[in-house]
């Protein structure tokens, strides 16, 4: 059945899903028999599209998790207050699972998530069904499954092996810092960065992330000078503006540690192509595939929470021998594109028991304690505690206004518009559909 017909027959769909969701499913529809999909297949594809928009890289198909996700996030509509509430007639998990089976007419790849030696290929039809013990477990787009596999593989390899540059250990670099004050977690972060192909430094604002990075660079400089060698380093962030802020902050912190930027660069060569991730990789509108190989000793990426999974995977894929140091606040807003890459890496490493990767900085050096207390309650999802902190400090923390609701709506509109523009650029929809938004 044509998607337009299905929308007419299911008016609730027009409230639950956004135009961009229908645009994505319309692309799949053209691959179906006679250019159409069954109702349950279209429903499954729409739920996948919305889950991507909400920063989930896949749609879980296990009954309990699928039901929970639909109830809390996917089967929701905007209410009178400007927020979201549960819509009526939540589809049964069995209906969605049946729709996934019917999507097989599109020829999606089927892989066993327990078969770690079977890589995901970028070549083939758009969809991919991941199974567990022969049972469908996730529905995803192939390109995101491919990106997730690259990230996961690097995490596992980094946790299970050390990689020393000319025998330089983390302890050696930490010892060179001498009397420079460092927290125990900060020293651990430097050790991980020096000895692992991938490490993560995370913490909220004012937790000392920049101090740790500056200390790492100073420690590398002192080690290189003592050994008579040089290290090559690239600094980058998701946007050019973030990259400028990163470099300025690091320079300031290096200076506070008693070093000059010029002396540091005698032994730690900072790539002059440092800047945005796109600039470092050589990504341009006319070049998205022939990317630059990153052969630096270290690549330090700030504000990683802003990176989507595909871009993060590109960094990893093009830096096979580099020590990657990812820095960011996992509790910040995730990328406007697909995936909460930093949060997923941290949670994934913790769930899998992968050690030697993540360093969490928890000491607050910047904010008033009441703001820190309020933010902590929000991050834990404890609404009662957050309200109690607000009531004790009305001069510091204020309630949201209608203007804040307007900001949220504009952000959602901008995200929808961006996805529509991408679809139009790929020829998956017409410019008139973009203008209609």
Predicted segments with their positions:
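N-terminal accessory nucleic-acid engagement/regulatory domains that precede
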Residues: 2-168
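N-terminal pre-P-loop "Q-motif" helix
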Residues: 179-195
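Pre-Walker A (Motif I) flank of P-loop NTPase domains
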Residues: 185, 195-201, 231
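Hydrophobic positions on the alpha1 helix immediately C-terminal to the Walker A/P-loop
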Residues: 212, 216
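Conserved helicase motor core of P-loop NTPases
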Residues: 226, 331, 335-437
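Inter-Walker segment of RecA-like/P-loop motor cores
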Residues: 233-295
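Walker B catalytic acidic pair
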Residues: 302-303, 328
């Amino acid at each position: 059945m044509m998607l337009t017909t299905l929308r007419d027959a299911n008016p609730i769909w027009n409230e639950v899903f956004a135009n961009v969701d229908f645009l994505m499913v319309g692309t799949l529809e053209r691959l179906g028999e006679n250019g159409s999909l069954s109702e349950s297949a279209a429903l499954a594809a729409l739920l996948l599209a919305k889950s991507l928009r909400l920063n989930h890289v896949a749609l879980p198909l296990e009954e309990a998790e699928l039901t929970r996700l639909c109830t809390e996030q996917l089967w929701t509509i905007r209410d009178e207050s400007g927020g979201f509430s549960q819509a009526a007639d939540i589809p049964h998990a069995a209906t969605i699972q049946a729709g996934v089976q019917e999507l097989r007419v599109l020829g999606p790849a089927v892989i066993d998530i327990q078969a770690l030696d079977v890589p995901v290929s970028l070549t083939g039809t758009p969809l991919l069904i991941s199974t567990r013990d022969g049972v469908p477990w996730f529905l995803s787009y192939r390109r995101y499954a491919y990106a997730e596999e690259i990230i996961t593989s690097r995490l596992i390899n980094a946790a299970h092996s050390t990689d020393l540059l000319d025998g330089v250990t983390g302890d050696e670099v930490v010892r060179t810092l001498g009397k420079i004050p460092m927290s125990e977690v900060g020293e651990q972060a430097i050790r991980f960065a020096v000895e692992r192909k991938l490490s993560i430094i995370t913490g909220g604002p004012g937790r000392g992330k920049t101090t740790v990075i500056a200390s790492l660079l100073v420690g590398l400089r002192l080690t290189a000078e003592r050994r008579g060698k040089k290290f090559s380093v690239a600094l980058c962030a998701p946007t050019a503006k973030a990259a400028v802020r990163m470099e300025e902050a690091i320079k300031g912190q290096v200076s506070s540690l008693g070093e000059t930027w010029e002396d540091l660069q005698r032994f730690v060569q900072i790539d002059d192509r440092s800047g945005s991730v796109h600039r470092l990789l050589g990504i341009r509108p006319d070049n998205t595939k022939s990317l630059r190989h990153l052969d630096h000793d270290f690549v330090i990426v700030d504000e990683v929470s802003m990176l989507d999974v595909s871009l993060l995977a590109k960094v990893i894929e093009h830096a096979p021998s580099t020590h990657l140091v990812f820095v960011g606040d996992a509790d910040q807003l995730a990328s406007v594109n697909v995936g909460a890459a930093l949060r997923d890496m941290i949670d994934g490493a913790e769930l899998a028991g992968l050690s030697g990767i993540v360093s969490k900085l928890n000491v607050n050096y910047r904010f008033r304690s009441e703001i820190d207390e309020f933010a902590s309650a929000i991050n834990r999802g404890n609404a009662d505690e957050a309200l109690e902190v607000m009531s004790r400090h009305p001069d510091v923390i204020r309630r949201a206004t209608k203007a804040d609701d307007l900001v949220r709506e504009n952000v959602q509109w901008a995200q929808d518009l961006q996805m529509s523009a991408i679809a139009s650029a790929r020829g998956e929809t017409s410019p008139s559909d973009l203008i209609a938004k």
